[in-house]
């Protein structure tokens, strides 16, 4: 029986701790922060942190259907560079509380949950955002809406869709596969977005947050929350965020992989933003959608030198 609480009328599930024991390459002490949100009341967010407490802050946001485990190869590299690297789990993922109903997940709620984590609970300032997949869909909104909190931005295989441009066929295949799957094989989905082969133990680590289907409302909800038409509930806010990013001069390093058909079209859009102009933007070669798996240390080195330049 899952550990269940009710917050603001929302049923929240919590993954038992023993699911997270002895995960390969992930021996960071778990930390928790509580946020109070209008949507769900008190929600516990899990995160890991590495590096000196007084170092420049890098906030690493994962996406669908992963969790902070995705950043295990990057955290030590960033920490060794003197950076305070913080990787939270989105609500519904990892060690964070999981609203049990797909309908409890909205784009706006995810932006608010991460805002409350980063700014209310941890009071982070002069942050460099690193966002991949939904980590960028959420994180770029935070940068646009709270620019005073950010020193730099590193979008990696991500974007800010408004529904005004079409999504690639490969994305629709993923969307439909998630919608139709009776059992959502999280480890398989992560593997399908990697060039390197994950070990069985690594795949199991991606399955760890979800003991059964009941826990998977987050991964089930996310594809349908991406704005794909101009009348999507998040379109207006994302258009406003894009307009804001078009006026902000916060330094931006666009760090995409060479083999991600899902997000490749967003790279030129981001590189045209004022914060990205006149900068050498790295390409992480031999890496798929989950470039943290395929080229994590290389991406971390690029981020560290970018942070040093700020």
Feature names for model-found ranges:
Residues 35-43, 48, 80, 87-131, ...:
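Active-site loop/oxyanion-hole signature of alpha/beta-hydrolase fold enzymes
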Residues 24, 65-76, 95-98, 164, ...:
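Short N-terminal helix/helix-N-cap motif within the alpha/beta-hydrolase-1
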Residues 125-164:
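Conserved hydrolase catalytic core segment
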Residues 277-310:
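Catalytic active-site module of serine/aspartate enzymes centered on a nucleophile-bearing elbow/loop
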Residues 162-222, 226, 230-234, 239:
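Helix-rich cap/lid subdomain of alpha/beta-hydrolase
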